[in-house]
């Protein structure tokens, strides 16, 4: 039996029919265009982390900025104004790793730039690797750039550049084609044998033609090398998304008065950002790149002479306290080296001795806490929130205004609990300009990048994308 065909010609002969058809076609065209826009991933992601950038300073010097740096980011970008790290204390290494992995040191195991190795009882650098000298092997989870490599069967190109070794390596991830930093001795760019030598030829050529830069122009040196990395490695030239991690610095030196130097740092950083962002867009195309700009949440506070202003202060001696604790535990449980070591604000107990003597770990921790809390300068004592293979059993929180001092190493350690405000800014194609004051945490950056380039979030990341 033949099916009857629908004859729409009579409908098209009417003005109302033609109107409905035109409206229907326009709707289909709009839906198709929107679908295309939503599905196109940027060809290049540039993740810029600025060490010690602060919102209060950023806003204070706003009248001095040019149009294409911070002003453009704040006017054209999607700006999250209230950002913090979901753990404390924070330093450059733990911050950059959190941004890359979308999780905390509890999972990624990068708790700081340096920790005490319980097996050797010696300080260990966060990117130390006995085989390659330095590498990202200490990161215990995948990073967003690692997942990009996995998703593209290794075809995506991934690079990290920074002034410092740890920032370059940690931001680039395990599977990167290269991580590069400035050698403190030679002022030339260098890398690790961990990375494939084929991807390092461009930096050797770059070193050959570029003079060693001044210390106060390090941000410009990093941005210039990053632009050369894009050109020489053809980043963002095809439909496979590439990834470039760049670490800049808003850290203050000691060359002039703090207020004057702070102004100089932010004005200089503004110019560097403006030039770098424009340079990337010229090379890749404005519609083909997504920028992510954030900060480490860390800050160097100048030493304050509280005594001069009659503000309560003092010094807590970690070495003396560790000796006192060992004497106390020896009196309770018998003579022995119950305290193995101490580092920064942490005390390491002798796990083997505790186990051999069949002593309850929770009991010895409780007794230790009770003693330490009676010590002047101690506000609280906590157990380690992380793996005790790389952290102490007891974490001492000093009384506000007090510093922790180790007489053996002649080093002072102080953690300020003051909130350091900083933003997260997304800039690029299909990103709507908006200021959002809802508080967020930095572990949401990685899944947002992952969603934007249509890949999985890092394997320990449980945070939701921001958009």
Protein language model regions, located:
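Bacterial Sec-dependent N-terminal signal peptides
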Residues: 1-41
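Short, structured active-site-proximal loop/turn typified by the sulfatase FGly-forming signature C/S-X-P-X-R
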Residues: 58-107, 157-159
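A long, amphipathic alpha-helix that forms part
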Residues: 216-238, 251-289, 449
